[in-house]
Amino acid sequence: MKKKNWIYALIVTLIIIIAIVSMIFFVQTKYGDQSEKGSQSVSNKNNKIHIAIVNEDQPTTYNGKKVELGQAFIKRLANEKNYKFETVTRNVAESGLKNGGYQVMIVIPENFSKLAMQLDAKTPSKISLQYKTAVGQKEEVAKNTEKVVSNVLNDFNKNLVEIYLTSIIDNLHNAQKNVGAIMTREHGVNSKFSNYLLNPINDFPELFTDTLVNSISANKDITKWFQTYNKSLLSANSDTFRVNTDYNVSTLIEKQNSLFDEHNTAMDKMLQDYKSQKDSVELDNYINALKQMDSQIDQQSSMQDTGKEEYKQTVKENLDKLREIIQSQESPFSKGMIEDYRKQLTESLQDELANNKDLQDALNSIKMNNAQFAENLEKQLHDDIVKEPDTDTTFIYNMSKQDFIAAGLNEGEANKYEAIVKEAKRYKNEYNLKKPLAEHINLTDYDNQVAQDTSSLINDGVKVQRTETIKSNDINQLTVATDPHFNFEGDIKINGKKYDIKDQSVQLDTSNKEYKVEVNGVAKLKKDAEKDFLKDKTMHLQLLFGQANRQDEPNDKKATSVVDVTLNHNLDGRLSKDALSQQLSALSRFDAHYKMYTDTKGREDKPFDNKRLIDMMVDQVINDMESFKDDKVAVLHQIDSMEENSDKLIDDILNNKKNTTKNKEDISKLIDQLENVKKTFAEEPQEPKIDKGKNDEFNTMSSNLDKEISRISEKSTQLLSDTQESKTIADSVSGQLNQLDNNVNKLHATGRALGVRANDLNRQMAKNDKDNELFAKEFKKVLQNSKDGDRQNQALKAFMSNPVQKKNLENVLANNGNTEVISPTLFVLLMYLLSMITAYIFYSYERAKGQMNFIKDDYSSKNHLWNNVITSGVIGTTGLVEGLIVGLIAMNKFHVLAGYRAKFILMVILTMMVFVLINTYLLRQVKSIGMFLMIAALGLYFVAMNNLKAAGQGVTNKISPLSYIDNMFFNYLNAEHPIGLALVILTVLVIIGFVLNMFIKHFKKERLI
């Protein structure tokens, strides 16, 4: 067993030795070449010095223009042939300094452009161009790089001075352009003042002159009109219009006589007509005819029983004769004739269908129409499903049955519309299979747009109405509490007095014992409260009537009167009207189109079946030819049926005795009525007596009024003439007034136009003044700090002559050209290998001797835990001692400056403790797997070191734990980044490693994999 363990130990030792030798060879090759490069760079030319440019400059604005001096600096260096420049990020530049890819890193700071454009500042701040040289170079190489940086800085200062001079000249040119623009604006204002305002004002008095002339003319015409009218009225005689009512006009008398004669003549004519009609009517003939008809009916009634058998016999004979004639008929078509006709008819129809151009054109037209109809249906179905941007309301949401029920539909309607949605999905899948990916369609996602549409509540609101009558003796205050989700408009009336609907307390009149409360208003949902409102979908308004400032006494048994009038409106029904209606309409429209689509699908390409059509037509003709026999049999059946029903028909004809009796009674009544009329005609009518003598009284009436009516007519004619003259004058006055009104309107319009033009001119002048003031203000700022009193501003002069200064980012590592330094990469590698050896020593001891027990477990059950703590402490202390020794040696090798040594030693100690604790835990717990993980971490570090190029860092550098330790020491030695966070992380890792070593689980069977 011991021999086997020694074999395992020998294998592990050989692996470690091979790793160390490989590492030394790799480092010697890599960093030896770098050392040779450093020694050769002393004798090389300047173009062998690689300079990394890090541009962190942010653009700024100067005189309204964007300025990026960092980019200008880089473009300037791009044309430089003496040095080799590359623009990279800060991380790439630092990595290049680390592995020898770059000798100098120049950093353009973030505020470079802003500080460079301080031409208007009185005491401008200096600009610092930061740079850093590679660590560990020879003294001569370091001096050469310093010289390169100085040359680059001097060149850029010259370029920057040229930029300043160009900026000053541009400002002067802008000032010259602005002065010209000011003169142009002033000329434009003067021209507009002359055309817009001055000339119209000069023409303005002419409008007043025209108005005055029209007014004078209208006044004259009005005066003339009134004079003429007054003259006409004064010349009229009032007696002229008086009529003597004691007399009637002769024309009235004549008309009355004529009317009387007409009535008398009409009466005579009516009497003559009556007499003539009485003589012409032959009532006897009518009466005799009716009596004869009555006797015939009696005769027919008596013959009913004797004629029935004769009717039956006659009908039977006729039917038998018809049956014999039909049975004797034979079919004119034989079977062979029918078959020949079938063949000929088929050939004829086939030839007609094949050669008929009109039929072919009709079939092609039908086919094209079907294709166009199918295409239109597909487009309509696409529009029904897809939602177009902004304006489309006819689209389909991807809703389920539960969504429809939540929107207010019953279960039957929800099932109906859910089936339509499934049809839409089915059609969508068929459509997408036929179309490319870019033309695929989808149903619009549903997010309660139908069930939670609050647009009507936001725009229209909900009415709030309530009427209550409250009776109480001690109520003196009203408290109103509104729903915070709504804006209320309206009022609350209490006994006729109005109060706004808002959160408030109102003192009531205590003299009233009865309060009539009326609430009338509108509550509109707030847009920002929509989400909270949808939780309960209820609007609340509370009116609380009570007592103010009442202190309840302990012995006061009288209860305080409180009346709560609360309005709660559940608005769930107001949320889905418009949106739900639109969605159901869209679904119904799609359903109709989809049914048409399924009916026509597959028929557009189906060929026309000519053979089937021909067979159908021929079969129809042949069936008609062969149906002769069947038709003959059918006619015979009808004759048999008529014979069977003949008895019933005869009985119906002969058994109408009841109707005959009724007719006989009606005829008897008619005969009696005609007998009475005959008696009336036999009597002579009595003629009325008319007293024609009274008509003479009308003839004696006087017509003396005719003369006075003639005189009235003459006066009325004269009055009409005067009225026509007045009308002519009035028309003239109206025309003058209309002209006057037009002049006034024109005057008003001209005044308004002048006002508008004056306002436009005023605005333009104000804008010009503002532009001129802005120019004067900006021009005043140009080089306003160029002088300090009467002397030149020395600070500004010094800044403009040498604006950019260089700033060296100090390195922690002493730059001694005569001393070789060790790289942080090799330093980290040595620490890790030392920790692996230490971890393997602890692991080997534990395998050989067992777990270290400093305290016997028999004394206490907690002694095992104390032994684990002591073991972890021993491992950690070992790492601490090794870290202290390695740190002191490395401090001298790196020549760390005095102020940085303590932190450097602390970093080395913590790093060494982390390496020792973690590696020891891996070997103690997972053994060979732990060894594999340790070697894997080492291998990742080798790969990461090999992939460190100036262009960037590889993925392995990001996942390698040792690379982070390497970067930590490199950044600290170059004074780049603070190490506070790194020390905290290392401390946490030390604690974790210490705790892990306390809880080692030993398995019964141990072996190397």
Curated annotation (Swiss-Prot):
Gene3D superfamilies in the cross-refs: abc type-2 transporter like domain (3.40.1710.10)
GO cellular component, one term: plasma membrane
Cross-referenced InterPro entries: T7SS_ABC-Transporter, T7SS_EsaA
Membrane topology, from the record: Multi-pass membrane protein
Cell compartments where the protein resides: Cell membrane
Transmembrane segments: 7-27, 822-842, 869-889, 903-923, 928-948, 979-999
Domain of life (superkingdom): Bacteria
Keywords recorded for this protein, A-Z: Cell membrane, Membrane, Transmembrane, Transmembrane helix, Virulence
Disulfide bonds: none
Record's function text: Component of the type VII secretion system (Ess). Provides together with EssB and other components such as EssC and EssE a secretion platform across the cytoplasmic membrane in the host.
Family, as annotated: Belongs to the EsaA family.
Subunit structure: Homodimer. Interacts with EssB.
Protein name per the record: Type VII secretion system accessory factor EsaA
